C-alpha cells in the first residue's frame, strides 16, 4: 500500500492591533462601539489597580497566594464581552477582568484570596463558578455545565480559561475528548503566557503551538493575540 497523507491542516492567528498598537481599520472596523471601548478600558484599568493592591497585601503578609493578572487583562475581558449573560464563565485565577465585566464585585476577589468563603458566595444570575486554583480541574466543570445545558435544550455555552501548563494535565485531555465526542457547546480558552508555573513553555510542551492540541480531538482551533481585545 502506498504512503498517503492522512491529514494536513493549518491554524489561523488573529490580530487586529499590530506589535506597535496600530489598529487595522479593515479587520477591526465596527467590532466594538466607542462607548463600549471606553467601558472596557476602565475595567482593564480597575483590574490593574486591584492587582497592585493585592500584590502589596500579599508581599506584606496580609494575603496568602495571589497570582497576578497583569498583562492578561484583555483576553478574559474580550471573551466575557462577547458571551451572553447566561453563558457560563468558568475561570481559574487570572480572569479578574472578565469577572468584573460579568458583575462580580472586586471585593469578592479579595475575600477569596484572603481565605474568606464569602468570596465564593456568587450570585446565581452571574453564571460564574468559584475561582479554581487546582490546575485544570475547571475544564471538567465547564464541560459538565455545558453538557447539562445541551441536555436541557438551553441555548447557552460555557467558556473555561486555563494556562498553557494546564494542557499537560489529564483533566485537560479528558474534558477535550468528552466535549468533542458529545459535541458539547464549550469554549476552551488557553491563555498562553509561555510559563507553566516556573517551567518555560518550550520545556513543558514540544509542539510548535498549544492550539494544535485541539486538532487531535477533531475540534476547531484558532490563535488570537491575547493582548488584543479586538481579536
Functional labels for PLM-detected ranges:
Residues 1-29:
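Charged, compositionally biased N-terminal leader segments and the immediate start
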Residues 5, 230-231:
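Structural signature of the thiamine diphosphate
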Residues 14-21, 42-55:
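N-terminal glycine-rich anion-binding loops that anchor highly charged ligand groups
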Residues 16, 221-223:
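Conserved beta-strand scaffold positions in the cores of enzyme catalytic domains, especially
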Residues 49-52, 56-182, 200-206, 211-218:
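Cofactor-binding active-site loop characterized by glycine-rich and histidine/acidic residues
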Residues 94, 191-194, 226-227:
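Short, ordered loop/turn segments at secondary-structure junctions
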Residues 161, 188-189:
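Residue-level marker for buried hydrophobic side chains located in beta-strands
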Residues 185-187, 220:
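Short, proline-centered helix/strand-breaking motifs
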Amino acid at each position: 500500500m502506498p504512503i498517503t497523507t492522512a491529514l494536513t491542516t493549518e491554524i489561523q492567528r488573529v490580530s487586529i492591533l499590530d506589535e506597535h498598537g496600530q489598529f487595522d481599520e479593515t479587520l477591526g472596523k465596527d467590532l466594538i462601539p466607542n462607548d463600549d471601548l471606553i467601558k472596557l478600558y476602565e475595567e482593564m484599568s480597575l483590574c490593574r489597580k486591584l492587582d497592585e493592591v493585592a500584590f502589596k497585601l500579599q508581599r506584606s503578609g496580609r494575603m496568602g497566594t495571589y497570582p497576578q493578572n497583569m498583562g492578561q487583562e484583555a483576553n478574559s475581558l474580550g471573551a466575557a464581552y462577547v458571551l451572553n449573560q447566561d453563558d457560563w464563565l468558568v475561570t481559574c485565577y487570572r480572569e479578574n477582568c472578565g469577572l468584573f465585566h460579568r458583575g462580580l464585585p472586586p471585593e469578592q476577589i479579595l475575600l477569596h484570596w484572603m481565605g474568606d468563603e464569602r468570596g465564593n458566595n456568587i450570585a446565581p444570575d452571574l453564571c460564574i463558578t468559584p475561582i479554581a486554583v487546582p490546575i485544570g480541574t475547571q475544564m471538567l466543570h465547564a464541560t459538565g455545565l455545558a453538557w447539562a445545558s445541551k441536555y436541557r435544550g438551553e441555548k447557552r455555552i460555557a467558556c473555561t480559561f486555563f494556562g498553557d501548563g494546564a494542557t499537560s494535565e489529564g483533566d485537560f485531555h479528558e474534558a477535550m475528548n468528552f466535549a468533542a465526542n458529545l459535541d458539547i457547546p464549550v469554549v476552551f480558552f488557553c491563555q498562553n503566557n509561555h510559563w507553566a508555573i516556573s517551567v518555560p513553555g518550550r520545556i513543558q510542551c514540544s509542539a510548535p503551538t498549544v492550539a494544535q492540541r485541539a486538532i487531535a480531538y477533531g475540534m476547531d482551533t484558532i490563535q488570537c493575540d491575547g493582548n488584543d481585545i479586538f481579536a
